[in-house]
């Protein structure tokens, strides 16, 4: 059987319409789905990212950057909305890939989505832990250092006078008491004549708050999707209220002079050469790329398709509605932030504090002075409460992808078990929750964060190309929602996502390829042999490709991805060897995807049976093991020698 055999769309639609005690409970409305999306998208990072993008890249034009990032996100959201309304099944990008790009690609995407949902939930849990510890400190409660963070994380106890002295420089933000030790803190202590060794130092052994919130969210999701949605809705109302309160309290104290110049002149280096991405229009575009990650999360709505009451109507509402709400809020936040304080003052760890302080000074003697004085505490409370809703959506998404993969035979049958009373995929929810809790307790947030970003963007690329291919292979399938200006919008979505992927550090790419290589071994060892496609008839296997149509668009899209990658790295000012390594590893992924798309669109007429060939399983397993061994060797060389030979890792 071809590795690119697709699951019949008609069969997927039929499965989505099944009812009974062993299926997921349909209880979500369009409003529930919208709140799920908002809960996944809005995080505390928006305040930090806005300040950094304004100070380093776009200036006051960060407002335009925010709009551009929203538009780029909308391109991907349109693709998800079309798929979710056409194929309303809980597998998200996995199910869409199965219907268009074939089983092997679908498995890779399903495996990749673990990076987005499970790792994403763990990242949020670690961030939640930090806010809880800080929140408790405001009430005079010091959480034990040994239970604050991942094992080996160092904390230093700073006296109030030293903390105040460090905060005056506004290059880092510290609290009196225990703070995490990092290079920036060491450097700032050196500047004032101190070192870490001058103060008490302790190491953490376990992140207890992160572990506990993961357990709580897991139990909530086992209880029921409607109960989880109601909890999420209440939390989202609190979270958005905090954002709206900042906008309302600050908008009356905007200084219009802070908007001039709206797009600051482009910076130049010591030789007078313009610096790309530092103000000017290039800075506006770079700012949009930085801010884009604040919009990630809307795709999680698609994992709840089989629990929506009317998925064909409500899925596009949930996906696009949540993105629209967040875009409006984000644009207003950026407008207020750069309006109340000069963008030159926002290159600090807590830019929101600078904006609030500037507005509070202007508000002295007014009703808003007390509100603005309380805003740091309110935002911290909003973060503690709000990150809980993000975790709910992330932990909700992963079990439903496992559920779909199990229903297709790619995972064991027990992974698709539904609780007889709550009608939730309780087995995979508990497993996901356990994985998230363990990672939250033992893994550092910096390692988790970038893996989440690259996993999400890779899924965006696949879904964008999948929309084009499905338009070609299944032109007659009913589409309640259609991506406008196809294939232009899907191709632009794939290019934008690939551009942002290419900009992530090379060590993150190495981890992605290693993760995918492990997934390939599992596929050939188990999933290929147990796939339910093997039990379909040869008639169902036949691919009905319209005569006289040549699928040019998907191939053009992949060619543009390859050209974009080459342009991004082949002509940089990096050393020659670094350019070769940077370009080659990224091209490996895109060329592999291109080969799959080519054979899918031009070679599928050869597929007449879904029968399993044991030789394919054996050869595939051997090849995947060799591939994994090779990439382990490459990764070992990379981490041992790359920084030494080329001056650091991207």
Where are these regions (language model features)?
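Extracellular loop-to-transmembrane helix junctions
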Residues: 25, 49-160, 205, 244, ...
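Loop-to-transmembrane helix boundary motifs in multi-pass membrane proteins
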Residues: 30, 153-155, 163-165, 171, ...
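TM-loop-TM module centered on a large, flexible mid-protein loop between adjacent transmembrane helices
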Residues: 95, 102, 133-148, 265-279, ...
């Amino acid at each position: 059987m071809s590795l690119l055999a697709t699951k019949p769309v008609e069969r997927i639609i039929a499965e989505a319409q099944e009812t009974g005690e062993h299926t997921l409970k349909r209880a979500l409305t369009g409003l529930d789905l919208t709140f799920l999306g908002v809960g996944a998208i809005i995080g505390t990072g928006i305040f930090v990212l806005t300040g950094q993008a304004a100070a380093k890249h776009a200036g006051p034009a960060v407002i335009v950057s925010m709009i551009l990032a929203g538009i780029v996100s909308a391109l991907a959201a349109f693709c998800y909305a079309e798929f979710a309304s056409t194929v309303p099944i809980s597998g998200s990008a996995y199910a869409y890939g199965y219907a268009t790009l074939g089983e092997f690609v679908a498995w890779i995407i399903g495996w990749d989505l673990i990076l987005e949902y499970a790792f994403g939930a763990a990242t949020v849990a670690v961030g939640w832990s930090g806010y809880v510890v800080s929140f408790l400190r405001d009430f005079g409660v010091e959480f034990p250092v040994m239970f604050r963070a991942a094992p080996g994380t160092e904390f230093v106890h700073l006296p109030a006078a030293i903390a105040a002295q460090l905060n005056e420089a506004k290059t880092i933000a510290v609290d009196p008491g225990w703070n995490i030790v990092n290079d920036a803190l060491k450097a700032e202590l050196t500047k004032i004549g101190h070192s870490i060794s001058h103060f008490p130092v302790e190491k953490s052994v376990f992140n207890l708050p992160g572990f506990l919130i993961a357990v709580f969210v897991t139990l909530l999701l086992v209880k029921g999707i409607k109960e989880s949605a109601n909890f999420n809705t209440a939390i989202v109302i609190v979270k958005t209220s905090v954002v709206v309160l900042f906008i309302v309290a600050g908008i009356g104290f905007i200084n219009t002079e802070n908007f001039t110049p709206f797009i600051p002149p482009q910076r130049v280096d010591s030789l007078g050469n313009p610096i790309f991405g530092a103000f000017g229009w290039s800075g506006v575009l770079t700012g949009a790329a930085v801010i884009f990650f604040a919009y990630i999360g809307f795709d999680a709505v698609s994992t709840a398709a089989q629990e929506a009451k009317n998925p064909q109507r409500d899925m596009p509402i949930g996906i696009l509605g949540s993105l629209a709400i967040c875009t409006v809020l984000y644009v207003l936040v950026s407008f207020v932030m750069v309006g109340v304080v000069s963008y030159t003052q926002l290159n600090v760890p807590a830019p929101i504090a600078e904006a609030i302080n500037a507005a509070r000074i202007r508000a002295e003697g007014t009703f808003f002075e007390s509100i603005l004085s309380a805003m740091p505490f309110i935002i911290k409370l909003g973060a503690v409460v709000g990150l809980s809703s993000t975790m709910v959506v992330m932990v909700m998404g992963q079990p439903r992808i496992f559920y779909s993969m199990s229903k297709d035979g790619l995972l064991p049958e027990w992974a698709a078990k539904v609780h007889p009373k709550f009608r939730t995929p309780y087995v995979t929810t508990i497993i996901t929750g356990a994985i998230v809790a363990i990672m939250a307790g033992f893994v550092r947030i910096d390692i988790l964060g970038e893996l989440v970003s690259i996993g999400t963007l890779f899924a965006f690329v696949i879904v964008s190309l999948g929309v084009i291919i499905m338009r070609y292979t299944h032109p007659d399938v009913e589409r309640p929602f259609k991506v406008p200006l196809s294939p232009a919008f899907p191709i632009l979505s794939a290019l934008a996502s690939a551009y942002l992927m290419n900009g992530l550090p090379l060590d993150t790419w190495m981890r992605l390829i290693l993760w995918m290589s492990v997934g390939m071994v599992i596929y050939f060892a188990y999933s290929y042999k147990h796939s339910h496609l093997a039990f379909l008839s040869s008639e169902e296997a036949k691919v009905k490709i319209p005569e006289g149509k040549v699928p040019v668009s998907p191939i053009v899209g992949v060619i543009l991805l390859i050209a974009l990658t080459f342009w991004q790295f082949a002509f940089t000012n990096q050393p020659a060897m670094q350019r070769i390594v940077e370009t080659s590893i990224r091209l490996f992924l895109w060329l592999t995807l291109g080969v799959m798309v080519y054979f899918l669109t031009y070679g599928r007429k050869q597929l007449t049976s879904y029968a399993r060939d044991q030789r394919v399983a054996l050869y595939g397993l051997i090849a995947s093991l060799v591939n994994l061994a090779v990439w382990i060797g490459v990764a070992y060389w990379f981490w041992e020698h790359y920084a030494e030979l080329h001056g650091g890792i991207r």
